[in-house]
Swiss-Prot record:
Keywords assigned by UniProt, alphabetized: Chloroplast, mRNA processing, Plastid, RNA-binding, tRNA processing
Subcellular location: Plastid, Chloroplast
InterPro entries in the cross-refs: Domain_X, Maturase_MatK, Maturase_MatK_N
Keyword RNA-binding: yes
Entry keyword Plastid: yes
A molecular-function term among this protein's GO annotations: RNA binding
Example of a GO biological process term: mRNA processing
One CC-aspect GO term: chloroplast
Similarity comment text for this entry: Belongs to the intron maturase 2 family. MatK subfamily.
Protein name stated in the entry: Maturase K
Amino acid sequence: MEEFKRYLELDRSQQHDFIYPLIFQEYIYALARGRVLNGSIFFENAGYDNKSSLLIVKRLITHLITQMYQQNHFLFYTNDFNPNKFLGCNTNLYYQMIFEGFAVVVEIPFYLRLVSFLEGKERVKSHNLRSLHSIFPFLEDKFSHLNSLLDILIPHPVHLEILVQTLRYWVKDPSSLHLLRFFLHEYPNWNSLMTPKKFSFYFSKRNQRFFFFLYNFHVCEYESIFVFLRNQSSHLCSISSEIFLERISFYKKIELEEVFTKNFKAFLWAFKDPFLHYVRYRGKSFLASKDXXLLMNKWKYYLVNFWECYFSIWSQPRRIHINQLSNNCVDFLGYLLSVRLKPSMVRSQMIENSFLIENASKQFDTLVPITLLIRYLSKAKFCNVLGHPMSKPVWAALSDSDIIERFGRIYRNLSHYHSGSLKKISLYRIKYILRLSCARTLARKHKSTVRSFLKRLGMGLLEEFFTEEEQVFYLTFPKASSTSGKLYQGRIWYLDIFCINDPANHE
């Protein structure tokens, strides 16, 4: 810890929460530039208490600084950037580098607070919690006992100045915040950042780390209203993953628990609920309760007022929905979630009489959104909007094995992700679309008919579309048809899925 602080020269500046001098340190931009080029995250290690090798880091910095000075900055132009040259330099490049460096600098105080907070405390270190599927066992265990659900879309900030204003409560360095405000206003195409769709696309493509920092900070401020519930409910579970800042903010919110409890003391009577669960992924969150819709209406009213008063955001009606889990399906992480009644009948035999007892239990159900998947395949030009398979002319120049392998990999990824559904029969339609699209692409390449290619390839084409479970079934029963692979119809949650792959992305 002390070596890391001395290396970053924070001993003197940390006393007054000044991070402004670090912006002028050259190695900060070398770290930021190297992290972007290598696609790695410097501060996000497997364990926070694991000391990195400073010798390796110093060698990396020296190499990156030398490489940066030797590179020609005019090669960094992009098509949609209009380079503004000042004294022969690309100013857009330096805007981007300062954004990347600022993201590194601002994370340093948060990182040091997290490390100091975790000193002497045991934490569960599990990479499995980063998997998207790790949240579904929790939903399966808890949501079957709940009735009402508040479906929330976290609103985007109407202006980035609001983010700067909220950031000043954490980073108490006016000079750094003024510099951030200056570059946000001077950044090219500033007006395009005001549109929510362009906001995420623009930053995620240009300055991914900086976008994550600003957006996660906005979400962290929004989630601060749930801190006071930790003392009121032992069932409140907060699952955060993937982003370094989210974990810092979660531990920091635990420290501020007493403060928020005092501030919200007058509202505890209205929101006290022993069966209240909160789950979020990116900009979508759920607040589920066992009580009737009265509590959900109170939460909806409170959230709308909180957004308007604290973030100056007018909440649109479509941002918050109150759903009954037994009557509605909710779209979350590529699944349709619902709670349905599962009827069961028990025969009771007494001495002389026997009678039937009808019983119904609640069951958490996960369905495959087949309409949404067909829409994705339609955008990727594998089929039309009705689900009729189409050829892929762009891939006609590839070899036959590459074409078959690409189609098979797309289906295996989709089947792998939706293995948690009990009704996997919906995936057979996706397999049909991709198989026929593959056959039509091959027929188009060789200027032949689809029937002749299916007859020529036979099982060779089918094997590429087998999942792991179907391969085991096929090897065990080689004479069985591939479409009858119903060896196991239960849910399978994989703990190695960290993102949802776009069907159009084939890399």
